[in-house]
Design a protein with these regions (language model features):
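AAA+ P-loop NTPase catalytic core and its hallmark functional loops
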Residues: 1-149, 158-159
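C-terminal helical "lid" subdomain and adjoining coupling/linker elements of P-loop NTPases
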Residues: 160-169
Length: 169
């Protein structure tokens, strides 16, 4: 059982805050820096880190991730000034990313080739209704099976409609 962390990069408005941290001011402490959850995650040995919606992330996030994901480097600089702390990625940390790649997806960006080269690409088909029911039942064990079946049915109909020539979704 490995520690896991989830980061929705598509919803990140400020990549630096999400991936590095923030500077704060307190009248008693003065100015201080607080590291992000991402910094904690990469310092956690054997962690599994999910970078969701990588293709929706701001390019600044990609730039920050380049050295973190490069197997030959595996570090994060908190600041580019001399003498600033460099965070090494802990042993056994695994990164997994999701991305919707292609022109048919809205609000996505074409991923930088250097960034893509840091991953093994696995293309996945959509789940069929039975697989989707099974996954939803696993993820939401307290939800009634009839509700789960309805959600999977509606999702399937929505996907078919979205891909039709006369989409009304």
């Amino acid at each position: 059982d490995r520690p896991d962390f989830y980061f929705n990069l598509g919803a990140t408005q400020d990549p630096r805050s999400t991936l590095i941290g923030n500077t704060h001011f307190d009248s008693k402490k003065g100015t201080y820096f607080s590291k992000s959850l991402f910094v904690e995650a990469i310092q956690t040995p054997n962690a599994v880190i999910l970078l969701d919606e990588l293709s929706r992330a701001h390019p600044d996030a990609w730039n920050i991730l380049m050295t973190v994901l490069d197997y030959g480097q595996r570090y994060l600089r908190l600041d580019e000034q001399n003498g600033q702390q460099t965070i090494k990625v802990a042993n056994g940390v695994t990164f997994i990313a999701t991305a919707n790649i292609g022109n048919e997806y809205t609000s996505t960006r074409q991923l930088d080739k250097a960034l893509m080269d840091r991953f093994t690409i696995v293309e996945m088909d959509l789940l069929n209704k039975e697989e989707e029911n099974e996954l939803l039942s696993y993820m939401f064990p307290n939800v009634d099976s009839k509700v789960i079946e309805s959600v999977a049915t509606i999702a399937g109909i929505t996907r078919v409609e979205a891909n039709s020539e006369t989409a009304r979704v």
